A protein has these predicted regions:
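Short basic, glycine-rich beta-strand/loop surfaces that mediate nucleic-acid
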Residues: 90-101, 164-168, 210-218
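Short glycine/serine/threonine-rich phosphate/pyrophosphate-binding segments
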Residues: 129-133, 224, 249
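Structured adenosyl-cofactor binding patch, chiefly the S-adenosyl-L-methionine
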Residues: 41, 139-140, 162-167, 226-265
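Short, ordered loop/turn segments at secondary-structure junctions
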Residues: 59-60, 80-83, 151-153, 178, ...
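RNA substrate-binding interface of SAM-dependent RNA methyltransferases
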Residues: 114-201
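N-terminal positively charged helical leader segments and presequences
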Residues: 1-113
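Active-site/ligand-binding-proximal alpha/beta "capping" segment
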Residues: 194-248
Length: 265
């Protein structure tokens, strides 16, 4: 039986190889803010990051920062209420926030297709909490990286970064325009793509062979888009003996990463 990628190949053409005055409104660069201790500490520890533009901390948090990092030049000691007026409404900042330029996207060629290597690719997964939780799981299970869309994907800041608990700065991320073309490029680099699809007959453990694998996950409700699914080498599902398919995409990613990690041993 031919794979989704093989079936798709017949229908397409050839491949193309100190302290400031505070505004009472949210900062204009609100999409570049990180908040929460773990997210901020991970960013400050990441040598690939640019210099902080602003670093806000309550007096107690400022002491923690100084004991770990010295006194950062951008540090501004403020009260919690003042910080809440600068950040987007509802930000659970835990007394610390950092405005810093975003991390640069890595190239697909930078991912090493070694034995047991695993990448995650997210197809229109737009909920920041879910993407943050997926990054956290990717870090926990030693994934090589996560591939996101330039569009239809949340920024790696704010609530997403807080949900990731520092994983934004631990897991390399690649942003691509077209997931189908990205899968073609990865195939040329030695990666095999396994898409998660609850309607197929193949179970995930049967689809994994221990080689360099891209686990492709779609959005909740919609699942994988047709062209993305067609560019996968195989489609597989997570067995659910309870008969109640209730896993959200972040839980499914964690289960898939665990299953993939078993093939390394």
């Amino acid at each position: 039986m031919s794979s989704p990628r093989e079936r798709n190949a017949h229908s397409k053409g050839p491949r193309k190889s100190g302290q400031r005055a505070f505004n009472r409104k949210p900062d204009n660069g609100s999409d570049e803010w990180l908040w929460g201790w773990h997210a901020v500490a991970a960013a400050l520890s990441n040598r690939k990051r640019s210099a902080p533009q602003r670093l806000l901390a309550t007096p107690d948090r400022a002491k923690e920062l100084e004991s770990r990092f010295g006194r950062p030049k951008a540090l501004e000691v403020v009260e919690s209420a003042a910080m809440g007026q600068i950040l987007p409404q509802g930000a659970v900042h835990q007394g610390i926030a950092l405005r810093i330029p975003p991390l640069e996207s890595v190239a697909l060629e930078d991912f090493e297709a070694g034995r047991g290597a695993v990448l995650l690719m997210l197809d229109q997964v737009t909920d920041p909490q879910n993407v943050g939780a997926i990054l956290r799981s990717a870090a926990a299970f030693g994934a090589a990286g996560v591939i996101l869309q330039d569009r239809h994907a949340p920024k790696l800041t704010g609530a997403l970064a807080k949900a990731a608990v520092g994983a934004v700065d631990k897991i390399p991320t690649a942003h691509v325009v077209n997931l189908s073309r990205a899968l073609e490029t990865l195939a040329d680099l030695g990666w095999r793509a396994v898409g998660l699809d609850g309607h197929t007959e193949t179970y995930l453990d049967q689809a994994l062979d221990g080689g360099p694998t891209v686990l492709v996950l779609g959005s909740e409700g919609e699942g994988l888009r047709r062209l993305v699914a067609e560019h996968c080498d195989e489609l597989a599902k997570i067995p659910m003996p309870g008969g109640f398919e209730s896993l959200n995409v972040s839980a499914a990613a964690a289960v898939a990463l665990y299953e993939a990690s078993r093939t390394r041993t």
